[in-house]
Amino acid sequence: MHLLENPSDNAIFMSGIVVGIVDKTNILMSLKIVRITRDFPDMNALEQIAVEAFPPQEYVSPQDLLSYTESSDDCDFWGFYAGKDFIGYLHLIRYKNMVYVCFFAVGVSYRSCGYGSEILSRLKELYPAYQIVLDIEAADESAPNLVQRIRRRDFYRRNGYVPTGHYIAYWGMTFEILCSGGGFD
C-alpha cells in the first residue's frame, strides 16, 4: 500500500476512528458500514440497487424492509459505502446463534470488483459468534438463468459458504441453503 497525498479525502471513519482507506484508483481497501434507518440519506440509491438486484417475484421494497426492521429487535439493516459512494446493503435476522441473510445486494457498477466479498467478510466481523446462513436460487438445470445461479453459488463458495444439503421453497421457487462453515442444524 502506498501513502496517500491527502489521506483525509480517502479515510473511512466509523465512530471517529479510521477503519479503512479507499485509494485514488478506486480499488477497495475497506468499507464504511452504516445502519439504515428512516433518515438514511441515500434512499434513492438503495431503491435503485434493490430494483436492479432482484427480479419482481423476489423484490421487497426498502421501505418494507425498514418497517420490518423497526418492528423487530432481531433484525438489522446495513448499508455499505466505498468512500462517498453507496454500494450495497444487507438485511438480516438474528436468531439464537444464527444470522439469516434475507437480502444482500451490491450495485451493478460495483459488482465483480471485490466489494461483495469484502461485505461478506465484514459481516463475519460484525457477528463473530453467529453462523451466517443464506439462501440462493437452486441451480436447476431448466432455469433460464442457470449460468447466473451457478456464478452466484460459486461466489459464495469462494467466500467460505458451504451447501447445507437443505432447500427451502417460497415465492414459487426453490432455494438452496448455504452457511458459513461448520455444521448446520
Model-predicted segments: where are they?
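Conserved acetyl-CoA-binding loop of GNAT-fold acetyltransferases
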Residues: 152-164
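Conserved acetyl-CoA-binding loop-helix of GNAT-fold acetyltransferases
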Residues: 106, 112-126
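C-terminal "cap" of GNAT-fold acetyltransferases
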Residues: 149-150, 165-185
